[in-house]
UniProtKB/Swiss-Prot annotation:
HAMAP family: MnmC (MF_01102). It holds the Pfam family Methyltransf_30. This is tRNA 5-methylaminomethyl-2-thiouridine biosynthesis bifunctional protein MnmC. Transmembrane segments: none annotated. It comes from Haemophilus influenzae (strain 86-028NP). It comes from the Bacteria. GO terms for biological process: methylation; tRNA wobble uridine modification. Residues 269-670 are annotated as: FAD-dependent cmnm(5)s(2)U34 oxidoreductase. Keywords: Cytoplasm, FAD, Flavoprotein, Methyltransferase, Multifunctional enzyme, Oxidoreductase, S-adenosyl-L-methionine, Transferase, tRNA processing.
Amino acid sequence: MTFSVQHAEIHFNRNHIPVSDQFNDVYFSNENGLAETDYVFLQGNQLWERWISHNEANFVIAETGFGTGLNFFAVTQLFREFRQQHENHPLKRLNFISFEKYPLKITALSQAHLAYPQFEDLSAHLQRYWPSLILGCHRIHFGETTLDLWLGNVSENLPQLGDYMNERIDAWFLDGFAPSKNPEMWNDDLYKLMFRFTKPNGSFATFTAASAVRKGLESAGFNVTKRKGFGKKRECLSGLKIQSKSTVLSTPWYLAQPAKMEKQDVAIIGGGIASFCAAISLVKRGAKVTIYCEDDALALNASGNKQGAFYPQLSDDNALTVDFYLHAFSYGRQLLDWAIEQNIEFEHEFCGVALCAYNEKSAVKLTKISQLGLPNEIFQMLSAEQLSEKVGLPLNCEGGWIEQGAWLAPRQFVQNAFSFLEKQGVIIKTSQKITALSQQEKGWELENTQGQKYCHEVVILANGYKITDFVQTEKLPLYPIRGQVSQIPTSENLLKLKSVLCYDGYLTPANQLKTSHCIGASHVRDNVDRHFSEQEQQENQQKLQQNIAQPWTQDVNTSDNLARVGIRCSVRDLAPMVGNVPHFEQQQADYYNLFNLRRRKQPIQSAANFQNIFLIAALGSRGLTSAPLLGETLASIIYGEPLPISEGILHNLSANRAWVKKWLKGSKVE
């Protein structure tokens, strides 16, 4: 398993232009890099003229070679000007997908940005959220423009856009170092993928006029035109996709399918963190959102704890799940920062998270995680002495340290964040238990326990373990897990705890009033009893005292019997679910013979799903970390926009994955 990439090695020439040591080429023109960007890419793709005639809500640009971000800054600024001049135009959002094999170090990035002070606000935001060296897609929001920065080799990352992105890209910035300097990137496989992902009448533009590039693009299917080059360059290329070619889907059983909407009217069933994260991503896209929560207040189930840990679920046995959580952790931090900037009040502390090697099994697991090559700010292995210093209390074991980890107050966060959304027009209906969904001509009818009915175009199920209460979802292999979290008084010793401490359970630092801590949680599968358990209360205390055999743990006292019980939703492989709700009976009919269909290379239909019903499910005990990226992914699917995750991760999160794995083996699904 490889999750990390390498930094670029560069120097600055006498014109203060960054130069790649790997490729011995400049990042942008010595003459006027911004003018070259404008001429080659913005004018070469006729962006302004095409935006004027564009009749969809979003426009997608893809780029090879992010470099310093100059092209991105220029097109973002141009799009801002377009939106200011055309406020009522159908085009509302710009998606910019860029691939970078060797990202700059933050110091080099900030130095390069000094050359373009007119982009100061954009460069400051990019520098703030400049990603760790984690392979794959990193989504960063810049108002109405969204950047998907894919780190790693474009030959590996571009295919990960997957079947979903077929014919969804409007324009290409074919950039990067010159073909003579970087021949590995400029190849026929790249051009074929570009053509596959480009919309009919979509375009490309590039600074080069190299014969091999022109022939490769023409062979892929583009109509290529030579135009005058920038500055001293004689010629450059641009082109269009005039005719489409049929493309065989590689994994039709996992194909994500957008919603069909006219009014952008979305109902979300559920009142916790998953519901909020879906809602905020939808609201940013202009959706009219209504929340249906069966409790008399929001965040009363699994999202209702006073303190919860925020850190990625790392393991040594499922690369795709680890990959998801690494990106979810980064994206989730952006959402928390956004909430703080919006003055949404919630207790929190970015204090780090310690993972204790409390027994032989956990020590082996953490050692294997340390061999994944993750950046130190994500994970590093520390000695018992080093970890004790981070934690603030003595430990008898080594362990992992997650520098960017945190704790926050989930119930306070969710309730206040929903109050913020209510002011943005989100309708919140509490004490509304939805019991049935019925498909109508233009959407779905929701019926509650009193027989009242509500109609919406799109429905999202985000109601935790009760997601299988509906006919449409009853076959999903989900199950409930009861978890009791204990609240304990602090002490002189416990006040020294500086970080979240994880073992076969967890202990948080003191809350902001410095009066109490949370310790938990029990884990009882297939149990939905919400009553207090004295046995589980004692077990929460005993697990800490047994795993961390230090005198200070005797201060932990659960005898006040202060606790709350939440019911989490989980699945056997421990990965969340997001996307379309699959139609089990129809997929069973289409795919029961999938093993033989593939072997014989026979045509295979795209997955049959319930139109306009989606879900976020199986968040388990990591909902604080996973929900923000899941919500953003789901909103992207619903609106048919580029996804912030790879095709591989999407497959690993698909609701029908357990069924498909059996069908692919020729096994029957009951």
